[in-house]
Regions:
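Bacterial Sec-dependent N-terminal signal peptides
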Residues: 1, 10-13, 17-67
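N-terminal phosphate-binding or glycine-rich loops at protein starts, especially the Walker A/P-loop
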Residues: 70-119
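Short internal beta-strands
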Residues: 120-128
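Glycine-rich oxoanion-binding loops at beta->alpha junctions
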Residues: 141-170, 183
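Glycine/threonine-rich flexible loop motifs
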Residues: 180-192
């Protein structure tokens, strides 16, 4: 065998070649040495090429990983939550921002994706602006039926902003997926509060699919005073609070802001390759 560094190479396969060269060479006295030199050089070259190939391969993989380390939203990390949805009646709180990146690179709605995966969705809870985002700011959102999926739409921006016990009847789990902007007076964090509160009261688990906060890199503005609490400001946080929707859900639980100090059975599906300094452009559905 030949040992070079960490490589161990058996020389037995080259024995016949060496003997053949020695037998038929005209340089009888020096051929064994020359043959051995050529063989050794050949083997060293092979080993060098092999090591170089491994190094280049590893570098290529690392570069590829770096290039593909784009932000992955919670909704796209289905392997972390799809098992929680099986054999259950699911209600989902979402709107037009609840999209996921498909294998072909295009974007499709989470509801369509889950239905395709045979997840039983019983209803959609619609926040301000409605399920399809067609209502104006402050416009009352009505209950109805989605024309594309046939699912029942239950408004959380109409006669009630908190799901009632009747609306949650028969629901085993609530999935929450809304893109927020990280500003206190946007109502999605208030909807999150009421959904968590209602589910805590009815002992229904909540899964929040985290999405980036485009304003997570800073905190700014005055903290809301309790005397001015309303649906456009429910919590004592700054105007720009610097948290993702998943982090905010954990804060609601941790600070015991829900009525009577209850806490929701909460699971947050985190983002991948994201920090509060990560730049992020909102995707568009194609």
């Amino acid at each position: 065998i030949l040992i070079i560094g960490e490589e161990i190479v058996p020389l037995s396969p080259f024995e016949k070649i060496t003997l053949f060269a020695m037998k038929y060479s005209t340089f009888k006295t020096i051929m064994p040495f020359r043959s051995a030199k050529v063989t050794l050089f050949f083997l060293c070259t092979l080993i060098s090429c092999k090591n170089n190939g491994q190094t280049q391969g590893n570098t290529s993989v690392q570069n590829t990983e770096k290039q593909t380390k784009e932000v992955v939203v919670g909704a796209n990390r289905m392997y972390l939550y799809i098992k929680d949805l099986r054999a259950k009646n699911i209600a989902i709180v979402t709107n037009q921002t609840g999209i996921v990146k498909a294998e072909k690179g295009n974007y499709v709605h989470l509801v369509d994706t889950l239905l395709k995966k045979k997840v039983s969705i019983s209803k959609v809870f619609a926040p301000e602006h409605g399920f399809r985002g067609e209502a104006d700011a402050g416009e009352v959102v009505k209950d109805g039926k989605d024309t594309k999926t046939g699912l029942s739409i239950v408004s959380l921006y109409g006669k009630n902003k908190k799901p009632t016990a009747e609306q949650l009847k028969g629901v085993d789990l609530v999935l929450f997926d809304l893109q927020d902007v990280g500003v206190r007076f946007y109502t999605y964090i208030s909807t999150l509060h009421y959904v968590m509160e209602a589910c805590a009261e009815q002992h229904i688990p909540v899964i929040v699919l985290d999405r980036p906060n485009p304003n997570a890199h800073y905190i700014d503005g005055a903290v809301l005073q309790p005397a001015f609490k309303s649906f456009i400001g429910m919590h004592p946080v700054p105007v720009v609070y610097g948290m993702t929707i998943g982090e905010y859900a954990q804060m609601i639980n941790g600070e015991k802001w829900l009525q009577a100090g209850v806490t929701a059975d909460l699971k947050v599906i985190p983002l991948a390759y994201y920090t509060h300094q990560t730049s992020y452009s909102l995707p568009g559905k194609t």
